[in-house]
Amino acid sequence: FENEFVYLQKPTPSLYSLAGGQDVVYIGSFSRLLLPSIRISFMVLPPGLLAAYKEKAACYNQTASKAEQIALCQFIRDGHLAAQTRKLRRLYSSKLHQLLQEVERVFGTEVPIKIGAAGTSLALTLSTKLSKDALSRKARAQGLGLQIQKEGPEGITVILSCSSMKTEDFLPALTLLRKIVTEP
């Protein structure tokens, strides 16, 4: 869960605060904030687990490049990571707003829309006679990849992400999705 992209609602409290300051381990990576090809992950351990970690860490190899780690450290130290985060927040906020506009343009008010907690996705519940498998198959056959969240009596809920899609592709993809769910 990426709280740095939560801008449409109050951010979720950290696990550490929810656990009352008890033993919580944070594990993450910089793939979303920087480049997916930068395979540097991080782990934040509470002091009480550090000794156990050090005992086990010797059994594992470090696979991240030292040069990349040093460059990332300097990037963070110089404030560039914070600037990159602000830039991506603005970008994703704009793209999500555009996606919402295009959904309303194509589907009107006939589909329930829920905005994802991380601010980069929407959940649409589509009323269709298709099963989720049939919808997925028909969409795939026409070059549209769908992430189906659930199928229920109210319809099929699909997740639309704005983070990895160009804004100019929103309208054609949504138009195709509408055609797929409405055609007999």
Model-derived features: where do they sit?
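Conserved glycine-rich beta-strand-loop-beta hairpin in the small C-terminal domain of fold type I
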Residues: 73, 89-100, 111-125, 135, ...
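Short, conserved active-site loop motifs that form the nucleotide-linked donor/cofactor pocket
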Residues: 24, 111, 144
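Conserved PLP phosphate-binding loop immediately N-terminal to the Schiff-base lysine helix
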Residues: 1-14
